[in-house]
Swiss-Prot record:
Zn(2+) 2 binds at residues 141, 174, 211, 256. It comes from Carboxydothermus hydrogenoformans (strain ATCC BAA-161 / DSM 6008 / Z-2901). This is Probable endonuclease 4. PROSITE patterns: AP_NUCLEASE_F2_2, AP_NUCLEASE_F2_3, AP_NUCLEASE_F2_4. GO terms for biological process: base-excision repair. PANTHER family: APURINIC-APYRIMIDINIC ENDONUCLEASE (PTHR21445:SF0), ENDONUCLEASE IV ENDODEOXYRIBONUCLEASE IV (PTHR21445). Keywords: DNA damage, DNA repair, Endonuclease, Hydrolase, Metal-binding, Nuclease, Zinc. One of its GO terms (molecular function) is phosphoric diester hydrolase activity. Zn(2+) 3 binds at residues 177, 224, 226.
Length: 283
């Protein structure tokens, strides 16, 4: 079970390599461009070649790319929908260049059109992108359910997986989003019940990645506010219980906790993993 963190790509791929080595991270997540969208600067060919060689030698896993926040595949507005498809397509191309393992896409907002319409729109966009045979696996991420966000329930995720009908479409779960949406991912009983529901509705093989964040707000708040490890409503015991879960410990974990503090959170997470699973902190 590898653990890692979200890192900045500012300064290019060589700077990213330096940050990976400095943090002794086993996996990493990045935005391949500004999280606010805009034009994506092409990778420097020499830097890209060097980074790919480093990735293999270092055995970096996973390498995750996160799409910009501004995209919304569920939008009822045609212009935004088409822009979102184009943006994700470009990120898939860039992810393939990086030999990334996963591209994480948020389930979008229906913007008042209703969940049924929004989910259908999401499926429509994903079908277009999945038909284009990129190598990087797309993961849809659950949400906290703020405002008109969809993807906060397993029923939403199950619908998207089923209606898209593509065996390579996977799921990324976020610990903060789960709690905010009303799922108990803190107690052993709650974690077990959630795992069982996921297996029944979606299938364990679809679960590929965990975003690890504590939560500033309690269960059912519908507020997406990440907190540093052990400082929120999930807490130390919650993460210990997640590490003890056969369902959650079978996938890589990537921290998205706030700055400053995320680097210290990686050290803390490695120590917790060593304590619970007897995996050395630095391998």
């Amino acid at each position: 079970m590898n653990v890692g963190l979200h890192l900045s790509i500012a300064g290019g791929l060589l700077k990213l390599k330096e940050r990976i080595i400095k943090n002794k991270t086993e996996g990493v997540q990045i935005f391949s461009r500004s999280p606010r969208g805009g034009e994506a600067k092409p990778f420097n060919e020499k830097e890209l070649k060097g980074f790919l060689e480093f990735k293999e030698e270092y055995k970096l896993y996973p390498l995750v790319v996160h799409v910009p926040y501004v995209m919304n595949l569920a939008s009822p507005e045609e212009e935004m929908f088409q822009k979102s498809v184009a943006m994700i397509r470009e990120d898939l191309y860039r992810s393939d260049q990086l030999h990334a393992d996963f591209l994480v896409v948020h389930v979008g907002s229906h913007r008042g059109a209703g969940e049924e319409r929004g989910l259908a729109r999401m499926v429509e966009g994903l079908k277009i992108l999945l038909s284009e045979n990129f190598k990087t696996r797309i993961l849809i991420e659950n949400t906290a359910g703020s405002g008109n966000e969809m993807g906060y329930s397993l029923d939403h995720l199950a619908y998207i997986i089923s209606e898209t009908g593509h065996e390579e479409l996977g799921i990324c779960l976020d610990t903060c989003h789960l709690l905010a949406a009303g799922y108990d991912d803190v107690s052993p009983e709650g974690i077990s019940a959630f795992s069982r529901e996921f297996r029944e509705k979606i299938g364990e093989e679809r679960f590929c990645l965990l975003h690890v964040n504590d939560s500033k707000h309690p269960i059912g708040s519908r507020k997406d506010r990440h907190e540093n490890l052990e400082q929120g409503y999930i807490g130390r015991e919650g993460f210990i219980n997640l590490l003890n879960s056969p369902f959650f410990k079978r996938v890589p974990w990537i921290l998205e906790t706030p700055e400053p503090g995320i680097e210290e959170d990686l050290v803390k997470l490695k120590k917790l993993r060593e304590e619970v699973l007897k995996i050395p902190a630095d391998r």
